[in-house]
UniProtKB/Swiss-Prot annotation:
<dbReference type="InterPro" id="IPR023366">
    <property type="entry name" value="ATP_synth_asu-like_sf"/>
</dbReference>
<keyword id="KW-0375">Hydrogen ion transport</keyword>
<dbReference type="GO" id="GO:0005524">
    <property type="term" value="F:ATP binding"/>
</dbReference>
<dbReference type="InterPro" id="IPR005294">
    <property type="entry name" value="ATP_synth_F1_asu"/>
</dbReference>
<dbReference type="GO" id="GO:0043531">
    <property type="term" value="F:ADP binding"/>
</dbReference>
<keyword id="KW-0472">Membrane</keyword>
<dbReference type="GO" id="GO:0045259">
    <property type="term" value="C:proton-transporting ATP synthase complex"/>
</dbReference>
<feature type="binding site">
    <location>
        <begin position="169"/>
        <end position="176"/>
    </location>
    <ligand>
        <name>ATP</name>
    </ligand>
</feature>
<dbReference type="Pfam" id="PF00306">
    <property type="entry name" value="ATP-synt_ab_C"/>
</dbReference>
<feature type="site" description="Required for activity">
    <location>
        <position position="373"/>
    </location>
</feature>
<protein>
    <recommendedName>
        <fullName>ATP synthase subunit alpha</fullName>
        <ecNumber>7.1.2.2</ecNumber>
    </recommendedName>
</protein>
<keyword id="KW-0139">CF(1)</keyword>
<comment type="function">
    <text>Produces ATP from ADP in the presence of a proton gradient across the membrane. The alpha chain is a regulatory subunit.</text>
</comment>
<keyword id="KW-0066">ATP synthesis</keyword>
<dbReference type="InterPro" id="IPR004100">
    <property type="entry name" value="ATPase_F1/V1/A1_a/bsu_N"/>
</dbReference>
<keyword id="KW-0813">Transport</keyword>
<dbReference type="GO" id="GO:0005886">
    <property type="term" value="C:plasma membrane"/>
</dbReference>
């Protein structure tokens, strides 16, 4: 068989037409050193700050130091098998985590991967972990309450939707217990919750998850776990990942509550990363931008207005505001609130709940110190009935503390002073509350009414706890309809005042104290 020149030329033309070459430009580099979870890379000329760098074995590192001839990056996960000379490449993306309702009821790691053994999470939405906080024009003032269920908190340091309220205290003073009870109290409020555990023991996190499940709050909660066994990079990024998950609800006109437990450990993880990257240390060896570490996180907690939600959802949600309320936790050393990280976070947040080890050890739990605990914006969000009835609580406690210190040195006291001391002791006793026993607005109102209008004056100090239990049982059993209505509205007027008075009068008439 012979081919003529025309056929050959046609065949060549056909082959040339079918020839397809795809050229792909990739920005690659080479690892030049690996140490303590930090890798130095040579050759990545176009890398961005915070960009994800693809490593061998389906892992990623995050570029943090951009130097003249190398890039310092922190590895997200195990790094023992990484070696000098390995090739890495830019991805052109910053870190994103899955967000959405599919994560509710699940325990995930910093990267949003499930670690609870319940299978994959069905999810299509992703959000960057670093997002600029809403601007001043997009925000709305805080005027709706977040009920924690604690008498001491809801009456003296109320929290509003969109507020940042710091929980600060030494170790073992009930900081996590307070935050977990606040989450449990939201199970029927419609507020979605995110609990971010940073640098805690895995057994402690498992215990928290079990308690949330026992009290029916896990289905409404996302748990982001970066335990003590995780790398410093994952502990540093966990709060930002949790915040991105909370912002999903805020930006769609819903309300969310996020607990960061705790930001002291995040600051330590960031200090570790910064020192390994050879960044210059500052006060207490923290890097110079440790304030910015927390401010850019906590500024993302806010209440946004209807226009913001409508613009974000492209008109799907109208006439709704969204909020993300933050409860950051800070652990102090020997009650020193003037240390670097505590003062930073106090200055960023809208108030603080200070828990004292002396109060905790003397049996006053929650160990809230009313003298230095404050809520800067929560007062305008407080439920009307609680606001009206709780006015005398803080004053009574302040006078009691002052007189108690004086009474230690004075032997004979006049009747007015004795009366004030007795009242202060009873109020202190009444504000005690067990864990996992949050109270509704109506239940708190009944108790505060009893304090405000002298129904405790003839009750012995040792019987205060049983008086409270019996009073709540009587109110819920005999006035269920009124209690439900008060929970719904939270209003206070002459009619409600008369009803509360009749409840207390009826209770005192039927039982002797």
């Amino acid at each position: 068989m012979q081919l003529n020149s025309t056929e050959i030329s046609e065949l060549i033309k056909k082959r040339i037409a079918q020839f397809d070459v795809v050229s792909e430009a990739r920005n690659t580099g080479t690892i030049v050193s690996v140490s303590d979870g930090i890798i130095r890379i040579h050759g990545l000329s176009d890398v961005m700050q915070g960009e994800m760098i693809a490593l061998p074995g389906n892992r990623y590192a995050m570029a943090l130091n951009l130097e003249r001839d190398s890039v310092g990056a922190v590895v997200m996960g195990p790094y023992a098998d990484l070696a000098e000379g390995m090739e890495v490449q830019c991805t052109g993306r910053i870190l994103e985590v899955p967000v959405g309702s599919g994560l509710l009821g699940r325990v995930v790691n910093t990267l949003g991967q499930p670690i609870d053994g319940k299978g994959e999470i069905e999810n299509d939405d992703f959000s960057p972990v670093e997002v600029i906080a809403p601007g001043v024009i997009d925000r709305r003032s805080v005027d709706q309450p977040v009920q924690t269920g604690y008498k001491a908190v809801d009456s003296m340091v109320p929290i509003g939707r969109g507020q940042r309220e710091l929980i600060i205290g030494d170790r073992q003073t009930g900081k996590t217990a307070l935050a977990i009870d606040a989450i449990i109290n939201q199970r029927n409020s419609g507020i979605k919750c995110i609990y971010v555990a940073i640098g805690q023991k895995a057994s402690t996190i498992a215990n928290v998850v079990r308690k949330l499940e026992e009290h029916g709050a896990l289905a409404n909660t996302i748990v982001v776990a970066a335990s003590a066994s995780e790398s410093a990079a994952l502990q540093y990024l966990a709060p930002y990942a949790g915040c991105a998950m909370g912002e999903y609800f805020r930006d769609r006109g819903e309300d969310a509550l996020i607990v960061y437990d705790d930001l002291s450990k995040q600051a330590v993880a960031y200090r570790q990363i910064s020192l390994l990257l050879r960044r210059p240390p500052g006060r207490e060896a923290y890097p110079g931008d440790v304030f910015y570490l927390h401010s850019r996180l906590l500024e993302r907690a806010s209440r946004v207005n209807e226009d913001y939600v409508e613009k974000f959802t492209k008109g799907e949600v109208k006439g709704k505001t969204g909020s993300l309320t933050a409860l950051p936790i800070i652990e102090t050393q020997a009650g020193d609130v003037s240390a670097f990280v505590p003062t930073n976070v106090i200055s960023i947040t809208d108030g603080q709940i200070f828990l004292e080890s002396n109060l905790f050890n003397s049996g006053i739990r929650p160990a809230v110190n009313p003298g230095i605990s404050v809520s800067r914006v929560g007062g305008s969000a407080q439920t009307k009935v609680i606001k009206k009835l709780a006015g005398g609580i803080r004053t009574a406690l302040a006078q009691y503390r002052e007189l108690a210190a004086f009474a230690q040195f004075a032997s004979d006291l006049d009747d007015a002073t004795r009366k004030q001391l007795s009242h202060g002791e009873k109020v202190t006793e009444l504000l005690k509350q067990k864990q996992f026993a949050p109270l509704s607005v109506a239940e708190q109102a009944v108790i505060l009414f009893a304090v405000e209008f002298g129904y405790l004056d003839d009750v012995e100090l040792s019987k205060i706890a049983s008086f409270e239990t019996a009073l709540l049982d009587y109110s819920n059993r005999n006035h269920a309809e009124f209690m439900q209505e008060l929970n719904k509205t939270g209003n206070y007027n002459d009619e409600i005042k008369d009803t509360l008075k009749s409840i207390l009068d009826g209770f005192k008439a039927n039982s002797a104290w």
